[in-house]
Amino acid sequence: MSECGGRGGGGGSSSSSDDAEDEGGGGGPAGSGSLSPAPAASSEGRLRRGLRGASLMARRRPELLCGAVALGCALLLALKFTCSRAKDVIIPAKPPVSFFSSRSPVLDLFQGQLDYAEHIRRDSEVVLLFFYAPWCGQSIAARAEIEQAASRLSDQVLFVAINCWWNQGKCRKQKHFFYFPVIYLYHRSFGPIEYKGPMSAVYIEKFVRRVMKPLLYIPSQSELLDFLSNYEPGVLGYFEFSGSPQPPGYLTFFTSALHSLKKDYLGTVRFGVITNKHLAKLVSLVHSGSVYLHRHFNTSLVFPREVINYTAENICKWALENRETLVRWLWPHGGKSLLLNNELKKGPALFVFIPFNPLAESHPLIDEITEVALEYNNCHGDQVVERLLQHLRRVDAPAFKSLAPDPPARLPDPPLITASPCCNTVVLPRWHSISRTHNVCELCVNQTAGGLRPSSVSMPQCSFFEMAAALDSFYLKEQTFYHVVSDSIECSNFLSFYSPFSYYTACCRTINRGVAGFIDSEQGVFETPPVAFSSLEKKCEVESPGSVPHIEENRYLFPELETSSSSFTGLSCRTNKTLNIYLLDSNLFWLYAERLGAPSAARVKEFATIVDVKEESHYILDPKQALMKFTLESFIQNFSVLYSPLKRHLIGSDSTQFTSQRLITEVTTDTFWEVVLQKQDVLLLYYAQWCGFCPALNHVFIQLARLLPSDTFTVARIDVSQNDLPWEFMVDRLPTVLFFPCNRKDLSVKYPEDLPITLPNLLRFILHHSDPASDPRNLAGPPTAECLQNEAVLQQGHIAHLEREIRKLRAEIGTLQRAQVQVEARLASARRDEHRLLRQQHTLERQHDLLRLHSEQLQALYEHKTRELDEVARKLQELADASETLLTENTWLKILVATMEQRLEGRDGADDRVPPSKARSEHPEPPGAPRLPASTPLPANISSTLASEGSPENRTD
């Protein structure tokens, strides 16, 4: 104690001295009389004094230091646990409900029971599994289509729907789909065959029926022709069922048909079975188990069993690699896809939109399109193709001995004898503008007797397209006939570009205005009737030198003259613009047709269009014409000729949505010529919605429209992303400004690209190019002094007016700048207020969080104390019950002891026994002992003790 006291005393002395120092130091400045001590020195002094005081307190009371450290650690731990990130709260998903109704023929496994689906799949021959997600809009849309297909096929196919989104189902755990819905089909143990076609009931049913019956039975020659003339490629297998119910290779061929459906969900390759050996010989099938791939224009193939193993995968791969596509279906899925882009890059494409029902027994319109495609690509006059065309036309023809293609025979040399030619008179333009002479040529088509179409040799007149081809070749060589200056007829022969059996003869001579006839040819090959050229001369004088009359225009002057089918046959090989033919179902993809120019309110959804990406143009078949074989052939022929009479289709916006009461006129494709060709100066702005620079010019053109009079000047604009224009009016950059002067539309001017588009620059540009003095009509003579003076006065007036307008604009700009400064000041003040309010909001939110935390702590403390009080009350109740039980047992023990004493006394004095009643009276119960009623039974432990003591075994003699 003395040691601790010594330390305490030493500490006290030192502290007193330190305190004295502090007081002296603190009082020094005060007593020094300085009026304004440095704030830095005073703050450092206060900090030093505070630290000294804390150290003295720690030396005097070390237990306080330990308590403070412990309290700080406790606060840090509390802050760590309270401010740490709370665990994520995950709300369990709601249990799934049935996706299909209870009356639906579709078995709905809405809990994702994939194992049960696999179990029932083994017991069915054909099963369709529909994997869906309940939230998926496409799954919901496909639900009715699946039910409709199931209602028609439920007696043959098992339809099972599986919820593959329920997180506790086996389907979600085992399957990882990237999209919904997904349709799988199983044919017994084969599968899955995924269906990726349109989610339409008819298409789904058609695909399911193909899976049910992947092979078509061909019992007769008529059905064989139906099979071979189809636009889809076909594979035939020959099997003899007479010797065996399942001939060798049949099951492999059957499985290969299922493999083709698995790899090509559209089912474009059809598989058929022939059992008649005579019918099989028509397609060069002799041995049972042989497989034949039919191709229309290339050589048909027989599966090479000696080279490739005869397996289902190899047969399917061989058929898909060597198939020949005549007409192809396109199925855009509606999302981002390169499907159309990849097909259009192959060349010009003919898109035919037809309403298609895949469940229909026959498709007459598709048969006509197939006939057009066969004729279009039949370049060599193949006999098999001709026989198939006759079958499509339902023309009776003698049966061929074999439908297999014959080996190509050597073409005979063309004889020198020519058939009767057909001729057309052509007037070439004058070779010089001052020349009064023309070169007149007679162009004839000469067909050799060894041509591919012997029937055309005996024709007295050639077809229109043969003459059109001759003119195409002639115009390419017309430069050689420009300088023929001779009164005699000079003839020359040149070969056709596309046919080795045709050549053309051109006989030309030079004539003056007075010549009215044409003499006979020196070689006597043909005779020419006298022709008057007066009207032709007048026409040539009006037209430009590059304008040449063409024969294809006559077709529209005389529509009753129909072209023969022979001119269309093999046209794909005689033109450089070969078409690929595609079909689209207008019931599903009519929106594409509308974007290509089809009317939206069409009564019959039939439409045809040709799209040529390379030429950046497309053409449409007149919607007023019915879609049939003849119109398609004419449409293709008009596109294929060198000088096509088809007009490029222009797509534009609806002009009715733009009101006329505007400063700037909105131009569309339909109103372009009406606006540009009006008798006013027109300034046209080219813009697009995606052009970022274009909106910045709106205020410039609005001010320009306000400055210039609307009765003599029009400011217009056109959205070139929504409106097509003729090529001569297209531009290669945006924004672009074109100016069309009044009465001189052919002298349109483009605004300089290197000049900024501002209001003064635009005004100078317009004034420069709209000057009436620059009109070519006013350049005939020199202007007079009076005219120049009037023009100068007029220009001075214009300049003064423009200067006044510029001053007004500058004043408006100054006002707007001042208003802008005021608005910016108000915005800055508003931003400061906003920041202040945000800080207040954050402070209130922190206080609210603290109050909520304190409330939660109080609530937790209240619940804890309530539980403790409930526990204490329960224990007190248990003690009370135990005390009452002990008191009862004590009372009975006393009675038992008294009874035992009485019995002991009774044994000692057997002669002087006292009745129990007297014994009880001699030993009264202690006061305060509870008395049991007569009917109260003894406790179980006491009664058992008495019974054991009263038994004869416990008695002692």
Swiss-Prot record:
Alphabetized UniProt keyword annotations: Coiled coil, Disulfide bond, Endoplasmic reticulum, Membrane, Redox-active center, Repeat, Transmembrane, Transmembrane helix
One GO cellular component term noted in the UniProt record for this chain: endoplasmic reticulum membrane
Gene3D superfamilies, sorted: Glutaredoxin (3.40.30.10)
Membrane topology: Single-pass membrane protein
Transmembrane domains' residue ranges: 64-84
Record's subcellular location: Endoplasmic reticulum membrane
Domain named Thioredoxin: residues: 91-213, 621-771
Record-annotated disulphide pairs: 441-444, 691-694
Residue runs in coiled coils: 785-889
Quaternary state and interactors: Interacts with the cytoplasmic part of DUOX1 and DUOX2. Interacts with TPO and CYBA.
Its job: May act as a redox regulator involved in DUOX proteins folding. The interaction with DUOX1 and DUOX2 suggest that it belongs to a multiprotein complex constituting the thyroid H(2)O(2) generating system. It is however not sufficient to assist DUOX1 and DUOX2 in H(2)O(2) generation.
Name by which UniProt lists this protein: Thioredoxin domain-containing protein 11
UniProt organism field: Bos taurus
